[in-house]
């Protein structure tokens, strides 16, 4: 609605420029219409008075000191109300047969005092960001502008030791709106230090203005980006280049050393390994093989062999005798 009101005021301001032939738009032309100003002059000098043009020129000339005024954008409605009250006061003076030569300069001085009492706009805080609280309204053109700063903030370098925690704070040094603020995070891996959005991928699990990486590994080397938005409109993009350096922690180093030791002694081809089955000669030749259990087995084997030989001899003897 504010944009529509401003758009409707522009043709009136252009018409005023053509009629009054002033070099620049003043606050008077931004917050009053041509018909309102013409009506006031008609009340002062009459509908078709030869002094009508003189009155119109005097009206704009009295407010020329406000042509380059800049105000806090949020104070527009306050200033608009003040100009509305001024037009009503001038109409009352005209109805009371007052003089426009006195009324217009007096009204302009009062308006200057009101403008000096308005809340000032915040100064632009470099180096980046869409800073709505620093938006200003320019009477020289009846338009507003924000700080001429890029949306992308410079890359911040963060260096951590491998295995430690890396933390990023998505905080800007200018005031943010209080409502509908969201934070989204992206990551460009491979050790890239970049602001090119085509290299980034979303990190859906990262929420809020604070992000932690723990423990930091070499795979985390790259650029992390945080986008601050208000109602889907970007306000700032912050970048953090994470450089992971140094050896891993001591505990991890010892674990890796143990793992490498196991790999060194582990068989390469487990399917080719056969269990050791020593022969009788190997058992007798290796004293360490003659354990009590092995000696017991040897005795059992000897007894079985002797019994088998006895049985075979007896069976042979019976067969031989039965043949005779």
From Swiss-Prot:
Membrane-spanning segments: 296-316
Task: Give the UniProt entry's GO cellular component terms.
Answer: acrosomal membrane; plasma membrane
Q: Where in the body, by tissue, does this protein show up?
A: Detected at the sperm head, equatorial region, neck and midpiece (at protein level). Expressed in testis.
Keywords noted in UniProt:
Cytoplasmic vesicle, Disulfide bond, Fertilization, Glycoprotein, Immunoglobulin domain, Membrane, Signal, Transmembrane, Transmembrane helix
* InterPro entries according to UniProt: Ig-like_dom, Ig-like_dom_sf, Ig-like_fold, SPACA6
> What is this protein for, i.e. what is its function?
Sperm protein required for fusion of sperm with the egg membrane during fertilization. May regulate the expression of sperm surface protein DCST2.
The record's listing under Gene3D superfamilies reads: Immunoglobulins
Q: What is this protein called?
A: Sperm acrosome membrane-associated protein 6
Cytoplasmic side of the membrane: what ranges? 317-324
Biological process GO annotation list?
fusion of sperm to egg plasma membrane involved in single fertilization; sperm-egg recognition
Location in or out of the cell: Cytoplasmic vesicle, Secretory vesicle, Acrosome membrane
How is this protein situated with respect to the membrane?
A: Single-pass type I membrane protein
Q: What is known of its domains?
A: The extracellular domain shows strong structural similarity with IZUMO1 but does not interact with the IZUMO1 receptor IZUMO1R/JUNO.
Protein species of origin: Homo sapiens
Q: Where is the signal peptide?
A: 1-26
